[in-house]
C-alpha cells in the first residue's frame, strides 16, 4: 500500500518568527518581546491533526499537555506553543445540531454554518496581539458546550481544525497556513 501525504505551506507577506535573521537560543526567544506567530493547520477528520500538533509542539520545545482547568479541554500548551482545536468554536452542541429549526434534518458539526466565526476571529486577533482570551470548549465526550477556559498567548499559537482558513478575518490573521491532505486509505 502506498501512502501519499501532501503538505502545503504558505506564509503571510512579511511574516517572521523572530525579528531579524539571527539565530537565538530558545531561552532568548522566550524572553523576547514579540507578538505570537499564529499558524492555521487544516485537514479533514482523521488525518492526524492532533498527532501532528503533538509532534510539532515537541519540536518547538516543551512537553505538550492539556490545559489544566479541572475538566475536559482540547487545548494543548507548552512553553512555546498553544494549540487550539477549532471544534471548540461549534455554535451548537450535539442536541442543538439535531433539533435546530434552521436544519430540520439536522446538521453536522463539520458544516461551516456550525461555527462561531465572530468569536474565532476575535480570539485569533486577540491572541496575536498578545492578549489573553476566554475561549469556548466543545466537550467531545458529552457533546455539550462547556464553560469557557482562559488561554494566554505563547510565542507560537496554532489553530487546528477543518476550517482555519475559511473565514477571511481568521485567514488574514494567520502568519502561516498549513493544509494536510491525506489519502483516504491512511486516515484514522
Question: Where do the model's predicted regions map?
Answer:
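P-loop (Walker A) phosphate-binding loop of NTP-binding proteins
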Residues: 44
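N-terminal chloroplast transit peptides
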Residues: 1-21
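ATP-dependent NMP and nucleoside kinases share a basic, alpha-helical "lid"
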Residues: 146-188
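Short beta-strand-centered segment that lines the nucleotide-binding/catalytic pocket of NTP-utilizing
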Residues: 62-94
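Conserved nucleotide-sensing/catalytic segment adjacent to the nucleotide-binding pocket
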Residues: 82-85, 89-142
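ATP-binding Walker
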Residues: 47
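Walker A/P-loop
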Residues: 50
Amino acid at each position: 500500500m502506498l501512502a501519499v501525504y501532501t503538505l502545503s505551506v504558505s506564509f503571510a507577506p512579511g511574516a517572521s518568527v523572530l525579528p531579524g535573521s539571527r539565530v537565538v537560543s530558545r531561552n532568548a526567544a522566550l524572553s523576547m518581546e514579540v507578538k505570537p506567530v499564529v499558524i492555521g493547520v487544516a485537514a479533514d477528520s482523521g488525518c492526524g491533526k492532533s498527532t501532528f500538533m503533538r509532534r510539532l509542539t515537541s519540536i518547538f520545545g516543551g512537553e505538550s499537555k492539556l490545559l489544566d482547568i479541572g475538566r475536559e479541554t482540547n487545548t494543548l500548551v507548552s512553553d512555546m506553543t498553544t494549540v487550539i482545536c477549532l471544534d471548540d468554536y461549534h455554535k451548537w452542541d450535539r442536541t442543538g445540531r439535531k433539533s435546530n429549526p434552521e436544519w430540520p434534518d439536522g446538521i453536522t458539526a463539520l458544516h461551516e454554518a456550525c461555527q462561531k466565526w465572530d468569536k474565532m476571529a476575535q480570539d485569533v486577533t486577540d491572541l496575536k496581539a498578545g492578549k489573553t482570551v476566554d475561549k469556548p470548549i466543545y466537550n467531545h465526550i458529552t457533546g455539550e458546550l462547556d464553560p469557557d477556559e482562559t488561554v494566554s498567548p505563547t510565542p507560537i499559537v496554532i489553530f487546528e481544525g477543518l476550517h482555519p482558513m475559511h473565514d477571511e478575518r481568521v485567514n488574514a490573521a494567520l502568519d502561516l497556513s498549513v493544509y494536510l491532505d491525506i489519502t483516504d486509505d491512511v486516515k484514522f
